[in-house]
Regions:
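Conserved ABC ATPase "signature" region
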Residues: 187-204
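Conserved ABC ATPase signature
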Residues: 208-212
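H-loop/switch region of ABC-family ATPase nucleotide-binding domains
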Residues: 17-18
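Conserved ABC transporter NBD signature motif
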Residues: 140-154
């Protein structure tokens, strides 16, 4: 709605994006970049007519979410142990602000993936930072594997991936970032090399993290999560 409103005002919009579906009926043209160059320009009608093979060749995502299929996976057994339990957790940013979180309770089992969704400002990031021990709750309890945890204990067991990936880099290269905090054995080196290659980042291993594109930075943080020995990972 905001983009349409800007378009009606006569604004010129240039969007740098991977996701195309919400632009299908807004964009006039789609320009495809690769290797630092604009490789092709297509009208909206031409882009909509791309086959799946053409999109894959151009590294484009679908314009129609109905085309996306999600592979089925076996449901977790109901007896799977609880990894994380949040009980009546409350949090406020100040006396005048009122409760940002008011009595939040839920549990997550081991090996379970949960998507926490909601509008901007509803408290998603706040609850994530509480679980990671970055904030101290004003009430309630957070338990990991059946044991109550204080913020310091949570920090040792929960990895929190920020929205702003660059705030989590501390070394001078992609490879050193993945090795940071680990005992670098030959086995770990082989694992890291395989991971970098699987994420199409092997050629970037000696680059400074800040020189990466936004998408590459996000991939680096995901690789850091994969190599982490922390049992709980929160992706903000």
């Amino acid at each position: 709605e905001i983009l349409l409103a800007l378009k009606k005002q006569g604004k010129t919009l240039l969007l740098s994006e991977h996701r195309l579906y919400y632009l299908a009926d807004i964009a006039d043209e789609f320009w495809v970049m690769a290797d630092g160059e604009i490789k092709g320009k297509y009208t909206a009608a031409e882009a909509k007519a791309f086959s799946a093979e053409q999109r894959q060749t151009l590294s484009l995502r679908t314009l129609d979410l109905a085309e996306i299929t999600v592979p089925e996976k076996e449901p977790l057994p109901k007896t799977a142990p609880t990894a994380l339990a949040v009980s009546d957790v409350r949090y406020t940013y100040g006396r005048k602000a009122g409760d940002t979180l008011s009595g939040v309770s839920f549990s997550v089992r081991e090996h379970e993936i949960v998507g926490l969704v909601g509008a901007n400002g509803c408290g998603k990031t706040t609850i994530g930072k509480l679980i990671a021990g970055l904030y101290r709750p004003s009430g309630g309890r957070i338990m990991l594997f059946g044991k109550p945890q204080n913020p310091k204990q949570l920090q040792k067991q929960v990895l929190f991936i920020l929205q702003e990936a660059e705030f989590q880099f501390f070394t001078g290269s992609v490879l050193h970032e993945l090795q940071y905090g680990h005992v670098v054995t030959p086995e770990f080196e082989a694992k890291t090399e395989a991971l970098l290659k699987s994420m199409d980042m092997w050629d970037c291993r000696d680059r400074h993290p800040f020189s990466l594109s936004g998408g590459q930075m996000q991939r680096l943080t995901l690789m850091m999560a994969y190599l982490s020995d922390k049992p709980i990972v929160i992706l903000d």
